[in-house]
Amino acid sequence: MGGWSIALHGGAGDIPFSLPPERRKPREEGLRHCLQIGVEALKAQKPPLDVVELVVRELENIEHFNAGIGSVLTNSGTVEMEASIMDGNTMKCGAVSGLSTVLNPISLARLVMDKTPHIYLAFQGAQDFAKQQGVETVDSSHLITAENVERLKLAIEANRVQVDYSQYNYPEPVKDDAEKELPLTNGDSQIGTVGCVAVDSHGNLASATSTGGLVNKMVGRIGDTPLIGAGTYANELCAVSATGKGEEIIRATVARDVAALMEFKGLSLKEAADFVIHERTPKGTVGLIAVSAAGEIAMPFNTTGMFRACATEDGYSEIAIWPTT
C-alpha cells in the first residue's frame, strides 16, 4: 500500500475564468483550511471515515459552499439539505435528505450508519432522528443567506433551476416546462456541493458528500448526493465523491461506475475516473474526486472548472479551480 491521501471538492460547473477575487479567494481559503484539517487528522492516524466526516463538517460550516450554512433554496424559499457517507472497509453507509434545521447533515448521515439498521432517512423521519440523537439544530432561518435569497429571486424570475457554478449570461426565453441552468449576475459563480475522500496508509477508504441541492428546485427533490453509488461510494478499491448536475450523476451511477471499472475491467483509478467523466456523462455536467487503496488521486471534470484540493503523505498538495494542463 502507498501512504495516506486525501481529496476534497467544493463543486463543479461553469466557473468563469473572470471570477473576481472576492468570489474566488474565500472558497480557495476554505478548501485550504479544510485540507489542512484532513491532513492533520490523517497524520494523527484517525480512521478515514472520521476524517471525511470531519472535513465535510468544516465545509458545511463555510457559507461560501452549498452545504449546511449557505445551502441554496427551494422554489418555496426553504432549505432542504442532503448528505451521505460510506466506509469502504465495511461497506457500511448512511444517508439523509430533506433536512431544514440540522447544522451538519453529514454527521446525521454518520449516525444513521452507526445507530440504525437502515441506510437512508429523509424529511420528517430524519429530523425526528436528529432530535433523538441530540444533534445540533438551528432555526432554518440561520441557514439562509442573503446571497441565496437573491439567487432564488433570479431563478424564479428566469423560470429556471440552477446547478453549481453557473455563469451569468442574459437569460434567453425559456420554453414551458423546460429546465435550464440559471445564470448569475456579475460573472458570479454559484456555491457548490462539497465532498471528501480519504485513504490511510493501510488502504482503508471512505467517502462523504453534502449539499443543499439546486437553486429553485422543487420541494422534495432529491439529487445524487445522498444516493449511494451515484454521488458517494467507497469499497476496498476506491472512494469517490461526485459533484455537478445531480440528475446526470444519478443516470450514470457515477461513483459506483468508477469502482466497477476498476473491479471488472482492471482499469487504474485515473483511467476509470476519466472514462466515467469524459465518456459516460454529458460534457459540462459532472466532476468527481477519488482516491484508491494505493493512495492514488483522481480529480477529473468535464465542466469549465471544479473547486478542488488534495494532498498525499509524500508531501504533494494542490488547490485548483480550472484545468492545470
From Swiss-Prot:
Record's comment on post-translational modification: Cleaved into an alpha and beta chain by autocatalysis; this activates the enzyme. The N-terminal residue of the beta subunit is responsible for the nucleophile hydrolase activity.
Query: How would you summarize where this protein is expressed among tissues?
Result: Expressed in ripening seeds and developing nodules.
Q: Which UniProt keywords apply?
A: Autocatalytic cleavage, Hydrolase, Protease
Enzyme active site: 193 (nucleophile)
Binding sites annotated in the UniProt record for substrate: 221-224, 243-246
Which E.C. number(s) belong to this protein? 3.4.19.5
Entry keyword annotation includes Protease:
yes
> What the protein does?
Degrades proteins damaged by L-isoaspartyl residue formation (also known as beta-Asp residues). Also has L-asparaginase activity, which is used to liberate stored nitrogen during seed development.
**Which protein family is it in?**
Belongs to the Ntn-hydrolase family.
Question: What name does this protein carry?
Answer: Isoaspartyl peptidase/L-asparaginase
- Which species? Lupinus luteus
